[in-house]
Curated annotation (Swiss-Prot):
One of its GO terms (biological process) is base-excision repair. Belongs to the DNA glycosylase MPG family. The lineage of its organism: Bacteria, Pseudomonadati, Pseudomonadota, Alphaproteobacteria, Rickettsiales. It is an enzyme of class 3 (hydrolase). Keywords: DNA damage, DNA repair, Hydrolase. This is Putative 3-methyladenine DNA glycosylase. PANTHER family: DNA-3-METHYLADENINE GLYCOSYLASE. SUPFAM superfamilies: FMT C-terminal domain-like. It comes from Rickettsia rickettsii (strain Sheila Smith). HAMAP family: 3MGH (MF_00527).
Amino acid sequence: MNKLIPLPREFFARDTNVVSTELIGKTLYFQGKTAIITETESYIGQNDPACHAARGRTKRTDIMFGPAGFSYVYLIYGMYYCLNFVTEAKGFPAATLIRGVHVISPENLYLNGPGKLCKYLGINISHNKCDLINNNEFFVGDIGLKLPYSTTARIGITKGTDKLWRYVVTDITNLISQYNVQP
């Protein structure tokens, strides 16, 4: 049985697209629930019109400016929470949106969509600005799972749709069952 430990801050303090692709297959642990990350999107700096920090630093986007390895949680449409992980060097606003996961404990469940995964896991605005490194209840670990993924345009946005910054698992069949994770 593999012991799940948090990834180091250095993992997140890199190019956002590298982090987004390498998060595919990583394990999200949140308050007793374990899930494999299956879909991510990158939002990178003030030159990305879809990035919340495109217009500069605000109270809402302050967390995006770092340090890396913290959660950025916000509400969309007045009803759904979205989970992001802050990336890049401190002072540069960027984050990876977690769009989909495959829950492996306490049950086997595929959740496609950031709102669905936050609702199931119980993630809300109180989980904004959580340190994912020094935390035993909310973190990302690595069990060595490598999943094939496709790169596509981001979805659910109206600006920056030309960026191929969405990463989604292409075939998860029979891969996740190989791993037994103990948080």
